[in-house]
Structure formats: C-alpha cells, structure tokens
C-alpha cells in the first residue's frame, strides 16, 4: 500500500514541480558603510567592490534606516527578527525555518569566512547548507567582509547572494534595530531599493504569519534517503527539514522516507518503525492537516514519535495543547535549556517565534525541557509511550551538540518498539521504493514572498 501511495503521490507532484524551477530575485542584504577590511592571510582572496545602490530598511510603524545594496536589486518585505549567533550564517540563511523573515545579525561582521560549496556527503546530503537555496527573505548586517578566508570557501557572501538572485546593502546601526525589535517585538519590515523611502508603500508590507510557509518549503512528493546496512526505516514529515536533521538520523542507522507536510501518515505508519516531524517556518496554525494526521496516528498506532521545533508545536497541538506567539522569539546558538527529568542544563541552538503553552498540555504529557532565560517550554514527553519532542534543535548546525544524544534516545525507542513486536516486520525500503522515489526534495524552489501579499 505504501509503495503505491508514494509512487502515485510522486507522479502527481511531478507535473506541478516542473513549473517551479525558475529562480527569482526576492532577498536583499544590508552591509555597513564603515571602512572594510583590506585583506586576509592564507589564500588568494577574490575582491568585489561594494555596491553603490542606495536602499532603505523600514520597520512598519518604526524607524527607517538607509544603506547600500549588494547582490541583486529587488524590493522585499517580511518579518524582521534578530539572531545573536556569532557564526553559521550560511546555515542560517539556508534554514527553511527562516522563510519569510528578514534576518538581522547582531554579530557586526558577516562574510569573513566566505561561503562554501554545495558539495554533498555519502548520503547525498548538503555538507554545508541546510537546504539548496537561500530561504530568508532578507538579511541586515552592520558590515560585510568582501575579503574572506576559509579552506571550504568558494565564493564571497556578496557573490553568493548575486548568484542566488538575492539583492543586498551597510548601513544600518544594527544595535538600534535590535534594540527596537527587543522592545517592540518582531515587526513587519521591508527593504526598498532606491534613494528615498516612500510612505505610500506601507500597504505593501507582507505578513508571513498569514501565509502557509510550510507548504512552500515542504517537498512536493516523497523522497528516500538510504542508510546502507540500516535495519530501521523512519517516516519523516517534512515541514521544512534541515539537512543536518536528516544526517543525524541516517548516520545512526535509519533509512528515511521523507513525506510532504500534509501526507496522511497514519495510513502508512505500519510500514515504518518510527515517525519523525521536522522543523519548519511560520505559524503552526496553518498546518491543520498535519495536526489532524498526527492525532489520527497517535489514536491508531503505538509507533515511536519525535518532533523538533515546528514539529514539537504540531505534535503538541495534535494532543490538544495550544501555541502562543512570542514577543521576539529565540534565535541563537547559546540558549540554556533545563532537562526536567535529570536536572542537567544543555546549551542549545534555537530558531522559533512561537512556543507551546505548557499549561495546556494534557495530563498524559509532561514538560521535558524549559528555557532558563525566559521560562518558555522547550520540550514535552508522554508519560508512558515513546513520544517526545523538543523546541530547540539538537542537530545544531551551527551551534553546540550538547543535546544530540536525543537522536540516539529516539532511535533506542524505535529499536525497543521493534524488538517488542510479536511478529518481526522488515520495514526496510524495498528496491521498488528505492528505484521509484527521488533521492532529494521535490519541487522546492525559492519563491518571492513579496508576490504573495
């Protein structure tokens, strides 16, 4: 049954995916007008002069900042958020969870170690990016390094943005921007190319919270990632999955079949040893199909389940809990989360603007982790069944690996459940599935968010 469902789904998606292959200019980057570094040691450095196109960064009902664009030139709009991460800008910019957001870096210098290649590993996963394309609607930085140095780098940040048809610019006092966002909360904003800000454009602000962003970043048809010699087969619901989540699972001995976010997973769960729900962008309220499918799954199956980030929120909603929008979210690589079962504190990587309201969890679930900075919920677990989820990212990339053991815990749950079966079931992907399904995401391309106002 699963093989036929997956093959039919893949065939239906092929036609619509064919029309989404074009790349579009949809992002803008800001750089500071401060003096740029003159050079670096260790290798020949490509040099590119900064762009001279003026641009403005406008926060709705807030201040206007002026700067210079670098990369492609295009007007964009989205939700302005900030990250305090010191490194990992290639991973952050390609993280599907940032879809629809203008990302402000508090680190004053961005681009000093360049941008790596799109090389893939032994599992056909991207080594250095979290998805094949830039995902955020735009970035704002204080200063951009036109000279870079790193052994993995193949191009500069500005070259990468231009190649991805992404417009960028200095400018701005990012301290003032972050202060505003911290006090007022995440806000709608836009980046406009041109000399002057036009107040008449205020109506064109796009609120990504009103858009089903998961639909845009999720694979349009199932695909498979084989772990050679693996005895486990996990169904992963793709709400905008990061490459390193896939890598953490397949490298630990689990082959994966990755499904679109709205796939009726409860209908094929018997053909898998576990179910995993990935991270993703936007408001979880738009994923009602996923919530319904997960609720049906837990009603009809005892299969082990794990969720991360948006996957955590959707799993919580499926059991009746509620989510809330945070004032400015948690986006950093150094956020402490307390394990309430052991009393241990883990330094975690986080990227989310919504959180689960722990007071609404049903009695058969309990809090697993709590944020030591703001007290928000960071995880939950079932009291008797092998179901748990985390708001933070145990796969990091970038960030600390303190909590990567959670992938091992999940796969231990999967193996234990498989061993407890009265009749052994070989759920490994068949040769038919390996031959028919794609080996990477299907039909996911950059889309200009401004076009969906």
UniProtKB/Swiss-Prot annotation:
Annotated EC: 6.3.5.5
Pathway given in the UniProt record: Amino-acid biosynthesis; L-arginine biosynthesis; carbamoyl phosphate from bicarbonate: step 1/1
Swiss-Prot/TrEMBL GO biological process terms: 'de novo' pyrimidine nucleobase biosynthetic process; glutamine metabolic process; L-arginine biosynthetic process
GO cellular component: mitochondrial matrix
Gene Ontology terms, MF aspect: ATP binding; carbamoyl-phosphate synthase (glutamine-hydrolyzing) activity; glutaminase activity
Superkingdom of the source species: Eukaryota
Pfam families for this protein: CPSase_sm_chain, GATase
Domain Glutamine amidotransferase type-1 as annotated: residue spans: 233-420
Keywords from the UniProt entry: Amino-acid biosynthesis, Arginine biosynthesis, ATP-binding, Glutamine amidotransferase, Ligase, Mitochondrion, Nucleotide-binding, Transit peptide
Top-tier EC class: ligase
InterPro entries assigned: Anth_synth/Amidotransfase, CarbamoylP_synth_ssu, CarbamoylP_synth_ssu_N, CarbP_synth_ssu_N_sf, Class_I_gatase-like, CPSase_GATase1, GATASE
Cited Gene3D superfamilies: 3.40.50.880, Carbamoyl-phosphate synthase small subunit, N-terminal domain
Residue range covered by the transit peptide: 1-13
Disulfide bond entries: none
Protein location: Mitochondrion matrix
Function in brief: Small subunit of the arginine-specific carbamoyl phosphate synthase (CPSase). CPSase catalyzes the formation of carbamoyl phosphate from the ammonia moiety of glutamine, carbonate, and phosphate donated by ATP, the first step of the arginine biosynthetic pathway. The small subunit (glutamine amidotransferase) binds and cleaves glutamine to supply the large subunit with the substrate ammonia.
Record-stated family: Belongs to the CarA family.
Additional detail: In eukaryotes this enzyme is synthesized by two pathway-specific (arginine and pyrimidine) under separate control.
Binding partners and assembly: Heterodimer composed of 2 chains; the small (or glutamine) chain promotes the hydrolysis of glutamine to ammonia, which is used by the large (or ammonia) chain to synthesize carbamoyl phosphate.
Name assigned to this protein: Carbamoyl phosphate synthase arginine-specific small chain
Higher taxonomy: Eukaryota, Fungi, Dikarya, Ascomycota, Pezizomycotina
Gene from which the chain derives: cpa1
């Amino acid at each position: 049954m699963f093989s036929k469902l997956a093959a039919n789904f893949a065939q239906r998606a092929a036609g619509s995916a064919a029309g989404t292959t074009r790349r579009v200019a949809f992002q803008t980057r800001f750089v500071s007008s401060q003096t740029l570094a003159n050079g670096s040691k260790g290798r020949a450095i490509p040099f590119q002069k900064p762009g001279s196109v003026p641009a403005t960064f406008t926060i709705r009902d807030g201040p206007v900042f002026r700067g210079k664009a670098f990369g492609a030139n295009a007007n964009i709009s989205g939700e302005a958020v900030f990250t305090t991460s010191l490194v990992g800008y290639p991973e952050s910019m390609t993280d599907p969870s940032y879809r629809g957001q203008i990302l402000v870096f508090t680190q004053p210098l961005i681009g000093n170690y360049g941008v790596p290649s799109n090389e893939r590993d032994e599992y056909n996963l991207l080594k250095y990016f979290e998805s094949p394309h830039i995902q955020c609607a735009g970035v704002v930085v204080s200063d951009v390094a036109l000279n870079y140095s790193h052994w993995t780098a193949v191009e500069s940040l500005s070259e990468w943005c231009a190649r991805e048809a992404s417009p960028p610019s200095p400018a701005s006092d990012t301290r003032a921007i972050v202060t505003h966002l911290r006090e007022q909360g995440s806000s709608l904003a836009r980046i406009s190319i041109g000399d002057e800000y036009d107040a008449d454009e205020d109506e064109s602000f796009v609120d990504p919270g009103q858009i089903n962003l998961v639909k845009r970043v999720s694979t349009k048809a199932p695909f498979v990632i084989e772990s050679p010699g693996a005895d486990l087969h996990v169904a992963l619901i793709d709400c905008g999955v990061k490459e390193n989540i896939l890598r953490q699972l397949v490298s630990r001995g689990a082959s994966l079949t990755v499904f679109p976010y709205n796939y009726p997973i409860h209908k094929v769960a018997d053909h898998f040893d576990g179910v995993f729900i990935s991270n993703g962008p936007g408001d979880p309220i738009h994923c009602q199909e996923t919530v319904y499918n997960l609720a049906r799954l837990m009603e009809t199956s005892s299969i082990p389940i794990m969720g991360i980030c948006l996957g955590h929120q959707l799993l919580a909603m499926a059991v009746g809990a509620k989510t809330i929008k945070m004032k400015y979210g948690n986006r950093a690589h150094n956020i402490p989360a307390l394990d309430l079962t052991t009393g241990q504190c883990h330094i975690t990587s986080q990227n989310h603007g919504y959180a689960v309201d722990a007071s609404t969890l049903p009695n058969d679930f309990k809090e697993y982790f709590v944020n030591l900075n703001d007290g928000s919920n960071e995880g939950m677990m079932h009291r008797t069944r092998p179901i748990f989820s985390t708001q933070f990212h145990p796969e990091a990339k970038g960030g600390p690996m303190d909590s990567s053991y959670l992938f091992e815990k999940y796969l231990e749950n999967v193996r234990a459940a498989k061993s407890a079966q009265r009749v052994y079931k070989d759920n490994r992907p068949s040769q038919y599935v390996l031959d028919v399904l794609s080996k990477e995401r299907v039909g996911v391309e950059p889309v200009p968010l401004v076009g969906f106002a």
